[in-house]
Regions:
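Tandem CBS (Cystathionine beta-synthase) repeat/Bateman regulatory domains
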Residues: 1-135
Length: 135
């Protein structure tokens, strides 16, 4: 349960400014776009397969740590394919639980099979910190 026993939903905390990139973008290009937008992840959409994945700053750092060239490495070889999706109607507790269970820090938010947002651990903590304290 959220602090003070209040229930807030993913729609209350998610970002609706979503960075969407293609699978053939290089890691450097993805990192540059993420930096410019001040986001820690991007939704990777492959129009050929209608598939969706996610690339995070952690994925990029992992590749660089293994000595891979960010100018040559395509995003598609480093993204997460088995994306766990949230809905705007999930509670923040449900989102946090899914993140904990899956070991990740971002969830793509879908509504009617459309990407409508992204929620991160930071978004959840920020929303919880704004709740009034329990007396």
């Amino acid at each position: 349960m959220t602090p003070a026993g209040e229930t807030h939903h993913v729609r209350d905390a998610m970002s609706t400014e979503i960075l969407m990139i293609g699978p053939r973008h290089t890691l450097r290009h993805a990192a540059k776009l993420m930096s410019q937008r001040h986001v820690g992840s991007a939704v990777v959409h492959n129009p050929e397969t209608a598939g969706i994945g996610i690339i995070t700053e952690r994925d990029i750092l992992h590749a660089l740590g293994h000595g891979l060239d960010p100018d040559d490495e395509p995003v598609e070889t480093h993204l997460t394919h088995n994306v766990v999706f949230a809905t705007p109607h999930w509670t923040l507790d449900q989102a946090a639980e899914a993140m904990t269970r899956g070991g990740f820090r971002h969830l793509v938010v879908l509504e009617d099979d459309q990407v409508v947002g992204m929620i991160s651990v930071r978004d959840i903590v920020r929303a919880w910190s704004r709740l009034p304290s329990a007396a």
